Amino acid sequence: MNNVSLIGRLTKDPEIRTFGKGKDSTDLCRFTLAVRDGRDKDGNERTQFISCAAWGAVCEIIEQYVHKGDMLGVDGKIVQNNYEKDGQMVYQTEVRVGNIYLLPNPTNDNSGRSKARR
């Protein structure tokens, strides 16, 4: 079974790329979530920075409603991509997002924001 659920903050605005043209095009959003991961032995908070990718309708929602610093919940699966760069294989692990949840930002009153799920 390959399922992952995360809650974190976006480290910067999502990067959007469009593949194809016209009605056959689809969008890809890439973003990084800063996810709290407990505390170390000295009591300092640990943070994991998780790469995420969303396609199609989920990407469209992210593009419209999600910005740097926003709290976001995601459900998805872990995937590994690989490609060659300068003659070396590069391996990248990321979360392929299936659902998103726009969460309230405790430092900012976003009571007008609604949840979005795809």
Where are these regions (language model features)?
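Single-stranded nucleic acid-binding surfaces, predominantly the OB-fold ssDNA-binding core
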Residues: 1-118
